[in-house]
Design a protein with these regions (language model features):
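Catalytic glycan-binding domains that act on GlcNAc-containing polysaccharides
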Residues: 1-133
């Protein structure tokens, strides 16, 4: 993905988010109205100047730019950035951590699992995560 280099977000992380969000379906629409590969909400897409959320390159560009913003906001903490991608940055700020929503907690674990699987393919370490041992 071009956006990987442009926004300095690991390619495998982008792929993991897409897998968790839409299972690689560019026409995906969630029950809450999120659209496209990275499941951008209409207001988020508008704020990111994404005109067509169903256009894969444009959706990925916007989604990765948003993910970079969240990583910066939460000082590179991947867990918090992913939680915010799913539940919204205000929820993460309000709870001062991953919100107690089962959907969000499951989402973070799913993305991290996919990220680990994709990273193993090229033996890439996962920056911004904490040891769970």
């Amino acid at each position: 993905f071009k956006a990987s280099e442009k926004y300095n977000v690991n390619y495998h992380l982008i792929k993991a988010v897409i897998k968790a969000e839409s299972n690689f379906n560019p026409q995906a629409v969630s029950r809450t109205g999120a659209r496209g590969l990275m499941q951008l909400m209409p207001k988020t897409a508008y704020a990111l100047q994404v005109k067509d959320s169903f256009e894969p390159e444009e959706n990925i560009e916007g989604g990765v730019r948003y993910l970079r913003y969240l990583l910066n906001l939460f000082d590179g903490d991947l867990y918090l950035a992913l939680a915010a991608y799913n539940a919204g940055e205000n929820a993460v700020i309000h709870y001062r951590g991953i919100p107690p929503y089962s959907e969000t907690r499951t989402y973070v674990q799913r993305v991290l699992r996919f990220y680990q699987e994709y990273s193993k393919e090229t033996k890439t370490s996962i920056p911004g995560t904490h040891s769970t041992n």
